[in-house]
């Protein structure tokens, strides 16, 4: 056991985690040069296309160190995006140490900080690594000072390497073996294995990634899931050397995969503890905090025949992604679907794309909303995650919206722009600290504003230099209203949105204008209105298509023309009574972009 090292690689987006993993795998000979490819751990097509890591991946490698000993390295490559931070905390729970990778050109960014604090809270040994020293813009001295100043860990002798060229990666491994402590645990004690992650394989059923904390797990053992008490047979187990390799047992301190022929998706939840049926452990290991979704949106299959497949797909995906929340929902405009909860907009986009790709579904998404706390006049408190569930205005005593605490790190040059943006988003500044030429800003901003497009706009006002980390702080009373959209005097539930009273006029007007562009013209006039309660705040009309009935009139008898026009008018009126308006998918997505173009 003293030769096992478990560690994660944590860093801000694009600081080179996945490339460093590639080099480590290459040096330790996990894959032959022929099998090696760039970002070998980003196995999902989506990850490669966007160049981001979404799922944490684990690998077990053997490394022969300079002291002649052979060490087992179990390492986990983690995502860097704020939306996937729960993946990072799950990976860290399985480790004793973490490599904090910092780009020697960019310096410390907000996610670097957030992930590093997560690691420190879990009492992990953090080893700083300065990456990308081959860049002409690299300034390792300055960045080492930044790490000490902002993060507060000693970085004077931080390892310098370039994952791209492979310089210094050997030193990283030596430092790892020296500084990160071996796992603790009792190899003879009763088995306790933490489920770090699981996913669904069509042939094997549920595959779980486990970290053995105490005891040993052997092939063929009867394993008990502690939360449900169900017993399964450990059919196969092994390790990843990126490839799945079968083993006969997993020893204390190791990280490996396990297949128990579990067909039920909820059979082995992530964060649960496995133990032996015949010699069970006294208590379960502390799991992970359940992450609360911040953004909710309705997902509906385009054709209602896909509903069953859609339900199964969501089940399989939620196994792989513990933070996805979903419950059935029906809408008059869109039929049956699910209300899903996500950690942020990127998460929502990724999930939608994974559903469409991996399970071949066509989906319609409604506008994302956050959760509001409503105190009714009967003094009940309810939580509302969709505009259609909001009680009538006269039953609401107080409506409270979620406030997020946002930590931003940015160069001083962009401070003015960013402050203007935060104020426009109804933010309140709570803190501001200067570190060298970087500024750390803390703002409290309503979650609804952060979730919509704050991140994109922050990046664009600061030319990509500002970075953001946010978390839910509290609910706060504020003047929010529901804007309904009426098409030909019928409310369309899927188009309603909740917004601040100050913006409601402009939001309503903009939404109506957007709709006017997107709804195709029909044989009759379509009235589009935005309303708060019964008060109409904006209206526009999609003009009808009409045939020129006077074209065949030759000469000028006015009564003949009037008769024809009158007849046409009556026809249109009848049509309007029975006509339905088809809404294209773009119309639902228009709400997402309301408030973006006007800036």
Swiss-Prot record:
EC numbers on record: 3.6.5.n1
Catalytic reactions on record: GTP + H2O = GDP + phosphate + H(+)
GO molecular function: GTP binding; GTPase activity; guanosine tetraphosphate binding; ribosome binding; translation elongation factor activity
EC category name: hydrolase
InterPro entries for the chain: EF-4 (IPR006297), EFG_III/V (IPR035647), EFG_V-like (IPR000640), EFTu-like_2 (IPR004161), G_TR_CS (IPR031157), LepA_C_sf (IPR038363), LepA_CTD (IPR013842), LepA_IV (IPR035654)
Pfam families: EFG_C, GTP_EFTU, GTP_EFTU_D2, LepA_C
Membrane association type: Peripheral membrane protein
GO cellular component, one term: plasma membrane
Boundaries of every tr-type G domain copy: 2-184
Residues binding GTP, per UniProt: 14-19, 131-134
Keywords for this protein: Cell inner membrane, Cell membrane, GTP-binding, Hydrolase, Membrane, Nucleotide-binding, Protein biosynthesis
Subcellular location: Cell inner membrane
Gene Ontology terms: biological process: positive regulation of translation
Role played: Required for accurate and efficient protein synthesis under certain stress conditions. May act as a fidelity factor of the translation reaction, by catalyzing a one-codon backward translocation of tRNAs on improperly translocated ribosomes. Back-translocation proceeds from a post-translocation (POST) complex to a pre-translocation (PRE) complex, thus giving elongation factor G a second chance to translocate the tRNAs correctly. Binds to ribosomes in a GTP-dependent manner.
HAMAP family listed in its UniProt record: LepA
Sequence similarity: Belongs to the TRAFAC class translation factor GTPase superfamily. Classic translation factor GTPase family. LepA subfamily.
Name used for this protein in its record: Elongation factor 4
Organism lineage string: Bacteria, Pseudomonadati, Pseudomonadota, Gammaproteobacteria, Enterobacterales
């Amino acid at each position: 056991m003293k030769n096992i090292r478990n560690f994660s690689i944590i860093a801000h987006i694009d600081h080179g985690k996945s490339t460093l993993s590639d080099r480590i795998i290459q040096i330790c000979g996990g894959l032959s040069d022929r099998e090696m490819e760039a970002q070998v751990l980003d196995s999902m097509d989506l990850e490669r296309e966007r160049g981001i890591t979404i799922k944490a991946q684990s690998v077990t490698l053997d490394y022969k160190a300079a002291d002649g000993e052979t060490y087992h390295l179990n390492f986990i490559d983690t995502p860097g995006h704020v939306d996937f931070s729960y993946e990072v905390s799950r990976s860290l729970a399985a480790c004793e140490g973490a490599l904090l990778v910092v780009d020697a050109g960019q310096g410390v960014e907000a996610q670097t900080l957030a992930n590093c604090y997560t690691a420190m809270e879990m009492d992990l040994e953090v080893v700083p690594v300065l990456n990308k020293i081959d860049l002409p813009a690299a300034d390792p001295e300055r960045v080492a000072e930044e790490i000490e100043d902002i993060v507060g860990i000693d970085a004077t002798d931080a390892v310098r390497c370039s994952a791209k060229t492979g310089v210094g990666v050997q030193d990283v491994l030596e430092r790892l073996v020296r500084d990160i402590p071996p796992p603790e645990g009792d190899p003879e004690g009763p088995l306790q294995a933490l489920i770090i992650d699981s996913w669904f394989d069509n042939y094997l059923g549920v595959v779980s990634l486990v970290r053995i904390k105490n005891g040993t797990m052997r092939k063929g053992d009867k394993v008990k899931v502690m939360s449900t008490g169900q017993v399964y047979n450990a059919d196969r187990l092994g390790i990843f050397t990126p490839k799945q390799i079968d083993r006969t047992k997993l020893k204390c301190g190791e990280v490996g995969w396990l297949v128990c022929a579990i067909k039920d998706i909820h059979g082995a939840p992530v964060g649960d503890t496995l133990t032996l049926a015949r010699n069970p452990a006294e208590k379960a290991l502390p799991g992970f905090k359940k992450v609360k979704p911040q953004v909710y949106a309705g997902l509906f299959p385009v054709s209602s025949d896909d509903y069953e497949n859609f339900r199964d797909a969501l089940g399989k995906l939620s196994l792989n992604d513990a933070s996805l929340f979903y419950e059935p929902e029906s809408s008059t405009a869109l039929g049956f679907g699910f209300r899903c909860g996500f950690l942020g907009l990127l998460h929502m986009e990724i999930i939608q794309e994974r559903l469409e790709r991996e399970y071949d579904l066509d989906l319609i998404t409604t506008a994302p909303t956050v959760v509001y706390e409503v105190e009714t006049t009967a003094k009940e408190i309810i939580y509302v995650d969709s505009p259609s569930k909001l009680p009538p205005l006269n039953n609401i005593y107080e409506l409270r919206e979620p406030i997020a605490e946002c930590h931003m790190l940015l160069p001083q040059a962009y401070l003015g722009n960013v402050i203007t943006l935060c104020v426009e988003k109804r933010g309140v500044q709570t803190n501001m600290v200067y570190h060298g030429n970087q500024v750390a800003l803390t703002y409290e901003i309503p979650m609804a504003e952060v979730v919509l497009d704050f991140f994109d706009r922050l990046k664009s006002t600061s030319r990509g230099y500002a970075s953001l980390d946010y978390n839910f702080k509290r609910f706060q009373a504020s003047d929010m209203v529901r804007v309904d959209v009426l098409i030909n005097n019928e409310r369309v539930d899927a188009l309603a949105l909740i917004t601040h009273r100050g913006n409601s006029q402009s939001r309503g007007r903009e939404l109506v204008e957007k709709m006017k562009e997107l709804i195709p013209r029909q044989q009759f006039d379509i009235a589009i209105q935005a309303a708060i309660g019964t008060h109409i705040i904006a209206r526009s009309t999609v003009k009808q298509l009409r045939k020129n009935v006077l074209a065949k009139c030759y000469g000028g008898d006015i009564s003949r023309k009037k008769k024809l026009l009158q007849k046409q008018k009556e026809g249109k009126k009848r049509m309007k009574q029975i006509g339905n308006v088809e809404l294209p998918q773009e119309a639902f997505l228009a709400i997402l972009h309301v408030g973006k173009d006007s800036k």
